[in-house]
């Protein structure tokens, strides 16, 4: 029987492939209830997409703050080779502190996770000063000198820097103007003759003025009156526009794209912001109430780097893996389960179905690379559920249940995107019903 020509063929083929994949490929032994005794530590070690907070390397630390760099995404696995050009840095500082002027050899996407900041970008014709609040983001081009101030008297500042490397893939290097115990000023590497000619001054004066070691580190205490003077010229991020070419923008500038009583997702895509378009990156902010479930879904193009900012989450990610048995190459389904706590990072590859449950009130941020023209396809819920778009005639041949039974099953869930994480339909044995679910979807149980 013919079905509507308006139904997109690519969507039909993709969903049919997902639903029927277990008929062609072996399941990895993570069916419902199995491997429940596997320890969290063991699961983390076997999960190449999970990066615990202890995977950050400390680049600098003193009594005023710290700068940490996450290990390379592809350091322990070839599965994340597509992320070799990207690095994640975390900057934390105490109140009334300054990160000294420097420039990076990589493009940076700066995102404020906690607190407030004064960011000053220096250019040949002057400087731009911005006040950044929680949720603000801005792109800093490679080679741009900048410095950061925590102007608050009480609250710490925490910033996530997402680096896009290009000079040496996967390597981020910062060049500081000042001389510290850790590293001298890069100006000191020039010869005396070059410096004297450049500044038209004797070397002793240049050394005393610019090169002598003065600071214990690159994060220093700053007097309040000096902070107030710099703050007078600071511009705040605009919550009315997302398309500024060079000014900060806020993740919650617009209404959430998904929202109900269980959670919200704010998202800015490359199509809506020129800074993100230059980097081919999307940004989102996920907020969920304790016990809520972000239903199974997948991204068509974007690989999302999910950062746990506040709270705890239980995440299940489904992927396909190559396997060789008796000289024959086959594929198998694999469920990667993890509990994320503050500071942990999970990589969600494109096309990998994922579901997430809030173990407490939850706040997470996501950075999606290769994000242009990305689509998020839901596998459950009332709205934007791609399975609901499959006509009954095709469902008859796709699922164990009839097309009518599939439609009835999908009608049970009245909510969309975020739902109650506790199943309502429980059998006599205390287990959630999962009749007529193909193996792909049983991996989420």
Swiss-Prot record:
Description of how the protein assembles with itself and partners: Homotrimer.
Annotated organism of origin: Canavalia gladiata (Sword bean)
* PANTHER family, sorted: OS03G0336100 PROTEIN-RELATED (PTHR31189), VICILIN C72 (PTHR31189:SF41)
InterPro entries named in the record: Cupin_1, RmlC-like_jellyroll, RmlC_Cupin_sf, Seed_Storage-Functional
In this chain the Cupin type-1 domain maps to 49-207, 249-407
Give the residue range of the signal peptide.
1-26
What's the protein called, per UniProt?
A: Canavalin
**What does this gene product do?**
Seed storage protein.
Q: Does the keyword Acetylation apply?
A: no
